[in-house]
Amino acid sequence: MKKYDPTRYSSAVGEAWMHTSFKTKFTHEIFDIKEVREYCLNLFKEAFNRYKIECRKIGFDSNHVHMMIDLGNYSRPQAAKMLKGYTAKKLLQKFPLIKKKYFWGSGLWSPAYYMYSVGKDMQFMESYIMKQKYSLDNIVQLKLNSFVHATGL
C-alpha cells in the first residue's frame, strides 16, 4: 500500500487537487497555432514554478486548456487569477497581432473558469485531460527531459 505523503507548507499540510479549465475570451481557437500553444505551455510551467503549484497533467484544445493542479494554500479564485493573469499578460505581449485581431485590446481568458475538486476520480479526470487535442503528460517529467536535453546527459 502506498504511503500518503501530503504536501507540507509553513502552516498547513495537505493537497487540493483540482481539474481546472480556462477558456479563451470569445472562444477564439488560438491554440491551433503551434507556436502560441507551446509558448502558453511554457508560461504555465513558469507560473507553476513561480507560485509553487504542482501540475500533473495539462492538455490544450483549440480554445481552452485543461489541467490537473494542486492548489496548495491558494483558494480557487486566487489560483485562477494568478495563472490566468500571468499567462495572459506575457502571451499577449509576445503576440501583439493576436491581441489586436482576436481580443481587441482586452484579456486573453474568459472571466469564467472551471475548477472541480478531484478525489477518487483522479484517474478518470487525468484520462479526460490526456484526450484533449494537444495534451502533455507529467509536467515534472517534461522538466527533467528538458534538463537532460539541455545538459546533454
For the regions a protein language model found, what residue spans apply to each?
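Basic nucleic-acid-binding interfaces
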Residues: M1-L153
